[in-house]
Structures are given as C-alpha cells and as structure tokens.
C-alpha cells in the first residue's frame, strides 16, 4: 500500500490512515490460531470475512451504529493500490476503542466448557449443574475478556473487573448491546440452518460518546458457527471456521509457541471452503 500510511497491523487486519476521522481497514488472508499468526494464508479469507461482516453490519444497524462511513475504499487509494483493497477493505470511522472484548455465549463450548467443568461457572456467572458440552444455556451470557496485544492471550474477566476497567455505566451498556446483537443475529442464523454458539464483538465510542460496533461482526474468526442439522449436545459439533487448522495443529504436536509449523495446502483450502460455506448459508 503506497498511497496511505499504515497505522496498525493486527492478527488479521491492517489499518491505514485516511484523515483524522477515517481509516482504511484491510482484511488480509492471515490466520491466527492459539494467538500465533500462521505463515501460510487462507485463500480469499479476507474477502469472505469482509463480505460476512458487511452483511451483519447492515442487518444489525438498527440495534447499534457501526464503524462504516459509507465511503468506498476505491475512492481513497491510488490506482496502483486498487488490487490490495478489492473486496477486502472498508472505510471506517476512527473511534476510541473500548478496551474489552465483548464475548457473548449462547452455548457451552471451548474455554467456557473448560471453566464450567472446573467451577460450575463461566467468568463468575454461576450456571445450572449437569450441563453437557455444547448444551444451550438458559439464556445468553456476557463473558468479557481483556484485549490482549498481538501475540498475547486474551484473558477472561468477571463483570466486576469489566466495570473496573471501563466504568459501571459503559460496562452495562456494552453487555446489554452485545447480548441484544447476539440474540438478533442468532435468531436470523437459525432460519438459515446455523447455530451461533458464541461470538466476540468489539466496540468504540465516537466523538459524541455513542457506542459503535467496530472491527468485524459475527464472522467465522470471531464466532463459533455450527450446522444446526448435525448439532448434538454432549459432543463438540463441527464448525464453519478455523477448527480444521486448529485440529491439524493440535495433532501435529506443536507446542503453541511461535513459529507455527507450515500448514498443508489441503487443510488451508478446506478451511477456506468452510468460511465460504458460512457466507453462502448466511447471506444466501
């Protein structure tokens, strides 16, 4: 990218400065697993993520405003940079980030299931006894985590810790908005044969202090999507996401420290196909 200055490089997205109110966000084909960025890209992943996020930003715009400005990426870069933005970039508002990851869980899986088995609760929220892996929770729960730097692990925190970080009023607003976003999206996804097990939202505040959804929305990177037709509580359903790569890495004996081993092309292509299937199912 020659026409704009890079201001940040995340696990998946690169940010470039347009002016003091707007930035260009490019979704790359990078994949991170276990908080390590893999060397091998997933074909067309950035385009698929961008299409899924844009679909949800539009669908959920009545629940909460989002970071999109409505400007076209093609209008803010030089002609030579057009191939880098095609289908994978958005022009976004520059917001003051809320420094927590807003995780909502509707089902018991992943780190939530691990924690429940140890303590009967998740992030300090007590749950009924006797739940099985992948069980639907009585109601969706807000289980925030800290926002870690690239390469560090996000840490689950209690709601009280969340209040200590951002203040009681904003913490409650983030929680209520995140749960409403999850419920609205999960209801729609169910009509498309997809269960949204859990998801992670990121929020910012605009110049007026308005809570705004940013970064990405309900993608296979930020969410666990399960096919409804093969859902069976008591086992971990196959998901439309990077589980293929994670399973391959687990089986490889890798110690989860950088650098990660090279992931075979067929595993990466299967992962890309899963991402594409999620887009097709959701957006039809």
From Swiss-Prot:
BP terms from Gene Ontology: 'de novo' IMP biosynthetic process
Annotated CDD domains: SAICAR_synt_Sc
A Pfam family this chain is assigned to: SAICAR_synt
Metabolic or biological pathway: Purine metabolism; IMP biosynthesis via de novo pathway; 5-amino-1-(5-phospho-D-ribosyl)imidazole-4-carboxamide from 5-amino-1-(5-phospho-D-ribosyl)imidazole-4-carboxylate: step 1/2
Gene3D superfamilies: ATP-grasp fold, B domain, Phosphorylase Kinase, domain 1
GO cellular component: cytoplasm
UniProt EC number: 6.3.2.6
Record keywords, A-Z: ATP-binding, Ligase, Nucleotide-binding, Purine biosynthesis
Catalytic activity field: 5-amino-1-(5-phospho-D-ribosyl)imidazole-4-carboxylate + L-aspartate + ATP = (2S)-2-[5-amino-1-(5-phospho-beta-D-ribosyl)imidazole-4-carboxamido]succinate + ADP + phosphate + 2 H(+)
Family matches, as SUPFAM superfamilies: SAICAR synthase-like
Gene Ontology molecular function, alphabetical: ATP binding; phosphoribosylaminoimidazolesuccinocarboxamide synthase activity
InterPro entries assigned: SAICAR_synt/ADE2_N (IPR028923), SAICAR_synth (IPR001636), SAICAR_synthetase_CS (IPR018236)
Top-rank EC class of the record's enzyme: ligase
Similarity comment text for this entry: Belongs to the SAICAR synthetase family.
NCBIfam families hit by this protein: PRK13961.1, purC
HAMAP family: SAICAR_synth
The name this protein goes by in its record: Phosphoribosylaminoimidazole-succinocarboxamide synthase
Designated gene of the protein: purC
